[in-house]
Amino acid sequence: PAGAKVNAIVIENDGEFKEAEFQAKPYQDMTRDEVLAAIKDAGIVGLGGAGFPTHVKLAPKDPDAIEYIIVNGAECEPYITGDYRIMMETPEVLVEGLNIVLDLFPKAKGIIAVEDNKKDAIAKVSDCVKGDARISVAELKTKYPQGAERSLIYATTGRAINSSMLPADAGCIVDNVATIVAVKDAVKEGKPLFQRVVTCLLYTSDAADE
């Protein structure tokens, strides 16, 4: 914006279009530190907007104090549907990612929080966690800002946190749907974070009429 000159990188296409090969250690052989290192090396950050490094969030001072891993599937902002589509199309991948995170916190339970205007997504995810004693789906009232971190923690656990507290202070860790899926990709496939499901809106006169 200031018009300053900065260094730039020019990437030239070699025209070969080779598919990148990712490598990951077998998950069952990974230690906690190796899982966190895989998340860090893949560059996984919160995909809900803040961009906070996920490996830092998943390494609190006292892991045993974490009681809830909350997956934010509320997506309360108007028109946004990226996480909704993930829950609809690949709910099993979301659950797989959540189980990886839960393995880091043996005493914690997982809660996948979804607003009640997404009944079909709730049904899809609920079907995937059927019989899993550690994971539940919380159907939340549709309202703004239901997906805000503090609001979500209160809605799912009844725990209120003030502005000076972090979610970990209330025994909670919150990540959104896309972030949890990215964790799975990083840990089990060695895939770095270079893509994200997004919502595309088409504004035309015809669309406005409809």
Give residue spans per PLM region:
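Acidic low-complexity segments
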Residues: A2-L47, F52, P63, K119-D120
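Short coil/turn connectors at secondary-structure junctions
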Residues: K5-N7, E34-V35, K40-A42, D64-E67, ...
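Internal alpha/beta scaffold segment
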Residues: F17, Q28, E34, R85-V129
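Short acidic, glycine/serine/threonine-rich loops at helix termini
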Residues: E21-A24, A50-G51, V56-L58, I80-Y84, ...
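Structured alpha-helical segments in the cores of large, soluble enzyme domains
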Residues: D62, I66-I70, M88-L102, V183-K191
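Gly-rich Lys/Arg/Thr-decorated short loops/hinges at beta-loop-alpha junctions or inter-strand turns
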Residues: V71-D83
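Hydrophobic alpha-helical positions that pack around
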Residues: A108-S205
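A short, hydrophobic C-terminal helix/tail in secreted or cell-surface proteins
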Residues: D206-E210
